[in-house]
Protein backbone atom coordinates (compact mmCIF):
# COMPACT_ATOMS: atom_id res chain seq x y z
CA UNK A 1 0.00 0.00 0.00
CA UNK A 2 1.30 3.43 -0.89
CA UNK A 3 1.05 5.91 1.96
CA UNK A 4 0.25 9.48 1.10
CA UNK A 5 2.32 12.37 2.41
CA UNK A 6 -0.91 14.02 3.55
CA UNK A 7 -1.49 11.06 5.87
CA UNK A 8 1.93 11.68 7.41
CA UNK A 9 1.17 15.36 7.90
CA UNK A 10 -2.22 14.66 9.43
CA UNK A 11 -0.81 12.02 11.76
CA UNK A 12 1.71 14.45 13.24
CA UNK A 13 -0.93 17.18 13.47
CA UNK A 14 -3.46 15.00 15.30
CA UNK A 15 -0.74 13.85 17.72
CA UNK A 16 -0.03 17.52 18.42
CA UNK A 17 -3.75 18.10 19.03
CA UNK A 18 -3.79 15.39 21.68
CA UNK A 19 -0.49 16.51 23.20
CA UNK A 20 -1.39 20.16 23.78
CA UNK A 21 -4.69 19.22 25.41
CA UNK A 22 -2.94 17.14 28.04
CA UNK A 23 -3.08 19.31 31.15
CA UNK A 24 0.27 18.04 32.39
CA UNK A 25 1.98 19.07 29.15
CA UNK A 26 0.42 22.55 29.30
CA UNK A 27 1.74 22.98 32.82
CA UNK A 28 5.25 21.70 32.15
CA UNK A 29 5.81 23.29 28.74
CA UNK A 30 3.57 26.37 28.37
CA UNK A 31 5.84 28.06 25.82
CA UNK A 32 5.93 24.97 23.61
CA UNK A 33 2.15 24.70 23.81
CA UNK A 34 1.72 28.36 22.86
CA UNK A 35 4.07 27.96 19.91
CA UNK A 36 2.25 24.87 18.62
CA UNK A 37 -1.11 26.57 19.09
CA UNK A 38 0.14 29.51 17.06
CA UNK A 39 0.21 27.65 13.74
CA UNK A 40 -0.74 23.98 13.75
CA UNK A 41 -4.52 24.23 13.37
CA UNK A 42 -4.03 26.60 10.44
CA UNK A 43 -1.92 23.90 8.80
CA UNK A 44 -4.74 21.44 9.49
CA UNK A 45 -7.28 23.81 7.91
CA UNK A 46 -5.14 24.20 4.79
CA UNK A 47 -5.08 20.43 4.35
CA UNK A 48 -8.83 20.26 5.03
CA UNK A 49 -9.59 22.87 2.37
CA UNK A 50 -7.41 20.94 -0.06
CA UNK A 51 -9.12 17.61 0.59
CA UNK A 52 -12.77 18.70 0.41
CA UNK A 53 -14.45 17.37 -2.73
CA UNK A 54 -17.29 19.53 -4.05
CA UNK A 55 -17.83 17.42 -7.15
CA UNK A 56 -20.71 15.71 -5.43
CA UNK A 57 -24.48 15.87 -5.72
CA UNK A 58 -26.34 17.91 -3.10
CA UNK A 59 -27.41 14.66 -1.43
CA UNK A 60 -23.85 13.31 -1.31
CA UNK A 61 -22.42 16.54 0.05
CA UNK A 62 -25.22 16.83 2.61
CA UNK A 63 -24.42 13.29 3.76
CA UNK A 64 -20.71 14.17 4.05
CA UNK A 65 -21.51 17.35 6.00
CA UNK A 66 -23.90 15.60 8.38
CA UNK A 67 -21.14 13.12 9.23
CA UNK A 68 -19.30 16.13 10.64
CA UNK A 69 -22.22 18.07 12.09
CA UNK A 70 -24.00 15.27 13.97
CA UNK A 71 -20.91 14.05 15.87
CA UNK A 72 -19.98 17.69 16.42
CA UNK A 73 -23.34 18.48 18.06
CA UNK A 74 -23.19 15.35 20.21
CA UNK A 75 -19.63 15.96 21.38
CA UNK A 76 -20.08 19.70 21.99
CA UNK A 77 -23.22 19.07 24.03
CA UNK A 78 -21.46 16.35 26.03
CA UNK A 79 -18.35 18.47 26.51
CA UNK A 80 -20.45 21.41 27.69
CA UNK A 81 -22.31 19.22 30.17
CA UNK A 82 -19.09 17.72 31.55
CA UNK A 83 -17.60 21.21 31.87
CA UNK A 84 -20.33 22.10 34.38
CA UNK A 85 -19.16 19.20 36.57
CA UNK A 86 -15.39 19.18 36.07
CA UNK A 87 -12.80 21.98 35.84
CA UNK A 88 -12.60 22.05 32.03
CA UNK A 89 -10.96 24.93 30.22
CA UNK A 90 -13.29 27.03 28.02
CA UNK A 91 -16.30 25.35 29.59
CA UNK A 92 -19.77 26.74 30.30
CA UNK A 93 -21.13 27.76 33.69
CA UNK A 94 -24.73 26.68 33.08
CA UNK A 95 -26.27 23.92 31.02
CA UNK A 96 -29.32 25.70 29.59
CA UNK A 97 -30.90 25.55 26.14
CA UNK A 98 -29.92 29.13 25.09
CA UNK A 99 -26.32 28.59 26.21
CA UNK A 100 -26.05 25.21 24.50
CA UNK A 101 -27.55 26.51 21.23
CA UNK A 102 -25.16 29.47 21.29
CA UNK A 103 -22.26 27.12 22.01
CA UNK A 104 -23.17 24.74 19.18
CA UNK A 105 -23.95 27.25 16.45
CA UNK A 106 -21.96 30.37 17.34
CA UNK A 107 -19.03 30.09 19.73
CA UNK A 108 -18.30 26.35 19.81
CA UNK A 109 -16.30 25.02 22.77
CA UNK A 110 -12.95 23.44 23.55
CA UNK A 111 -11.20 21.83 20.57
CA UNK A 112 -14.43 21.43 18.60
CA UNK A 113 -14.19 24.89 17.05
CA UNK A 114 -12.21 23.22 14.26
CA UNK A 115 -15.18 21.09 13.17
CA UNK A 116 -17.39 24.18 13.46
CA UNK A 117 -15.07 26.08 11.10
CA UNK A 118 -14.74 23.08 8.82
CA UNK A 119 -18.52 22.76 8.42
CA UNK A 120 -19.14 26.48 7.83
CA UNK A 121 -16.34 26.87 5.28
CA UNK A 122 -17.30 23.62 3.55
CA UNK A 123 -20.94 24.66 3.14
CA UNK A 124 -19.99 28.10 1.79
CA UNK A 125 -17.44 26.49 -0.55
CA UNK A 126 -19.93 23.99 -1.96
CA UNK A 127 -22.78 26.46 -2.40
CA UNK A 128 -20.74 29.22 -4.03
CA UNK A 129 -19.15 26.83 -6.52
CA UNK A 130 -22.34 24.96 -7.41
CA UNK A 131 -24.95 27.72 -7.48
CA UNK A 132 -23.01 29.65 -10.13
CA UNK A 133 -22.07 26.75 -12.36
CA UNK A 134 -21.29 28.78 -15.49
CA UNK A 135 -18.83 31.13 -13.81
CA UNK A 136 -15.10 30.76 -14.35
CA UNK A 137 -12.93 29.24 -11.62
CA UNK A 138 -11.55 32.68 -10.81
CA UNK A 139 -15.05 34.11 -10.53
CA UNK A 140 -16.12 31.32 -8.18
CA UNK A 141 -12.99 31.77 -6.07
CA UNK A 142 -13.63 35.50 -5.78
CA UNK A 143 -17.25 34.86 -4.77
CA UNK A 144 -16.12 32.26 -2.22
CA UNK A 145 -13.52 34.65 -0.79
CA UNK A 146 -16.12 37.42 -0.59
CA UNK A 147 -18.57 35.27 1.38
CA UNK A 148 -15.81 34.09 3.73
CA UNK A 149 -14.79 37.70 4.40
CA UNK A 150 -18.38 38.83 4.96
CA UNK A 151 -19.15 35.98 7.35
CA UNK A 152 -15.90 36.47 9.30
CA UNK A 153 -16.32 40.25 9.42
CA UNK A 154 -19.99 40.57 10.30
CA UNK A 155 -20.74 37.42 12.30
CA UNK A 156 -19.03 35.77 15.28
CA UNK A 157 -19.09 32.28 13.74
CA UNK A 158 -15.88 32.42 11.69
CA UNK A 159 -12.33 33.60 12.36
CA UNK A 160 -10.77 35.42 9.40
CA UNK A 161 -7.33 33.80 9.76
CA UNK A 162 -8.83 30.32 9.87
CA UNK A 163 -10.98 31.12 6.85
CA UNK A 164 -7.90 32.35 4.97
CA UNK A 165 -6.06 29.05 5.45
CA UNK A 166 -9.09 27.01 4.43
CA UNK A 167 -9.35 29.22 1.33
CA UNK A 168 -5.65 28.66 0.61
CA UNK A 169 -6.23 24.91 0.71
CA UNK A 170 -9.10 25.28 -1.76
CA UNK A 171 -6.87 27.30 -4.11
CA UNK A 172 -4.23 24.56 -3.99
CA UNK A 173 -6.91 21.95 -4.71
CA UNK A 174 -8.06 23.84 -7.78
CA UNK A 175 -4.54 23.73 -9.19
CA UNK A 176 -5.30 20.02 -9.81
CA UNK A 177 -1.87 19.05 -8.51
CA UNK A 178 -0.92 16.84 -5.59
CA UNK A 179 -0.21 18.81 -2.44
CA UNK A 180 3.36 17.49 -2.31
CA UNK A 181 3.91 18.80 -5.83
CA UNK A 182 3.09 22.30 -4.61
CA UNK A 183 4.52 22.16 -1.09
CA UNK A 184 7.48 19.96 -1.89
CA UNK A 185 8.89 17.80 0.92
CA UNK A 186 12.26 19.21 1.96
CA UNK A 187 14.37 19.22 5.09
CA UNK A 188 15.56 22.74 4.19
CA UNK A 189 12.16 24.04 5.22
CA UNK A 190 12.96 23.24 8.83
CA UNK A 191 15.36 26.21 8.87
CA UNK A 192 12.73 29.02 8.76
CA UNK A 193 10.63 26.97 11.16
CA UNK A 194 13.43 26.84 13.73
CA UNK A 195 14.34 30.48 13.09
CA UNK A 196 10.83 31.73 13.87
CA UNK A 197 10.55 29.41 16.87
CA UNK A 198 13.72 30.98 18.28
CA UNK A 199 12.42 34.55 17.96
CA UNK A 200 11.07 35.71 21.34
CA UNK A 201 8.55 38.01 19.63
CA UNK A 202 7.47 35.71 16.80
CA UNK A 203 3.81 36.50 17.47
CA UNK A 204 4.42 40.08 16.33
CA UNK A 205 4.73 38.69 12.80
CA UNK A 206 1.11 37.54 13.07
CA UNK A 207 -0.26 36.12 9.80
CA UNK A 208 3.15 36.07 8.08
CA UNK A 209 4.68 33.96 10.85
CA UNK A 210 1.71 31.58 10.89
CA UNK A 211 1.95 31.15 7.12
CA UNK A 212 5.70 30.45 7.13
CA UNK A 213 5.39 28.02 10.04
CA UNK A 214 2.45 26.14 8.51
CA UNK A 215 4.06 25.81 5.07
CA UNK A 216 7.45 24.88 6.51
CA UNK A 217 5.84 22.26 8.74
CA UNK A 218 3.91 20.72 5.84
CA UNK A 219 7.16 20.54 3.88
CA UNK A 220 9.63 19.01 6.32
CA UNK A 221 7.32 16.56 8.14
CA UNK A 222 6.78 14.23 5.14
CA UNK A 223 10.50 14.29 4.39
CA UNK A 224 11.34 13.28 7.95
CA UNK A 225 8.80 10.46 7.96
CA UNK A 226 9.92 9.23 4.53
CA UNK A 227 13.31 8.51 6.09
CA UNK A 228 11.72 5.80 8.27
CA UNK A 229 12.56 2.40 6.78
CA UNK A 230 10.19 0.35 8.93
CA UNK A 231 7.07 -0.40 6.87
CA UNK A 232 5.07 -1.34 9.96
CA UNK A 233 5.75 2.05 11.54
CA UNK A 234 4.87 3.81 8.28
CA UNK A 235 1.67 1.78 8.16
CA UNK A 236 0.69 2.89 11.65
CA UNK A 237 1.47 6.52 10.82
CA UNK A 238 -0.59 6.30 7.64
CA UNK A 239 -3.49 4.65 9.47
CA UNK A 240 -3.56 7.38 12.11
CA UNK A 241 -3.40 10.04 9.40
CA UNK A 242 -6.39 8.55 7.60
CA UNK A 243 -8.47 8.41 10.79
CA UNK A 244 -7.99 11.84 12.30
CA UNK A 245 -11.72 12.64 12.58
CA UNK A 246 -12.63 9.96 15.17
CA UNK A 247 -9.42 10.69 17.09
CA UNK A 248 -10.23 14.40 17.07
CA UNK A 249 -13.79 13.78 18.21
CA UNK A 250 -12.88 11.57 21.15
CA UNK A 251 -9.50 12.88 22.28
CA UNK A 252 -11.02 15.16 24.99
CA UNK A 253 -12.47 12.03 26.59
CA UNK A 254 -9.01 10.45 26.61
CA UNK A 255 -7.41 13.55 28.12
CA UNK A 256 -10.11 13.91 30.77
CA UNK A 257 -9.78 10.24 31.66
CA UNK A 258 -6.02 10.59 31.74
CA UNK A 259 -6.28 13.16 34.53
CA UNK A 260 -7.35 10.35 36.86
CA UNK A 261 -4.02 8.63 36.22
CA UNK A 262 -1.83 11.68 36.88
CA UNK A 263 -1.06 10.68 40.51
CA UNK A 264 0.50 7.46 39.22
CA UNK A 265 3.15 9.49 37.40
CA UNK A 266 4.06 12.00 40.11
CA UNK A 267 7.64 10.69 39.99
CA UNK A 268 7.97 11.65 36.30
CA UNK A 269 8.80 15.36 36.10
CA UNK A 270 9.12 15.26 32.31
CA UNK A 271 5.47 14.27 31.79
CA UNK A 272 6.57 11.47 29.44
CA UNK A 273 4.63 8.77 31.26
CA UNK A 274 1.40 10.73 30.99
CA UNK A 275 1.87 11.33 27.25
CA UNK A 276 2.51 7.64 26.72
CA UNK A 277 -0.70 6.79 28.56
CA UNK A 278 -2.74 9.13 26.34
CA UNK A 279 -1.28 7.83 23.10
CA UNK A 280 -1.80 4.22 24.16
CA UNK A 281 -5.46 5.05 24.63
Describe these PLM feature segments.
Residues 1-281:
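Alpha-helical transmembrane segments and their immediate juxtamembrane cytosolic regions
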Amino acid sequence: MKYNNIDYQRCVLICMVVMIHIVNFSTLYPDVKNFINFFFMQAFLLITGYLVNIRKTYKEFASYTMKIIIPYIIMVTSYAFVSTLLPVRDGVNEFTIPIILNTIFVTSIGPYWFLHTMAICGIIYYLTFNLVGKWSIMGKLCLFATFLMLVSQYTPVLNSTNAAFYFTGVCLRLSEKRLDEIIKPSLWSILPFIAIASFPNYKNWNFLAVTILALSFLSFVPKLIQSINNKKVLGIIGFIGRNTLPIYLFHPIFTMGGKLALPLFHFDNSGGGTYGLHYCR
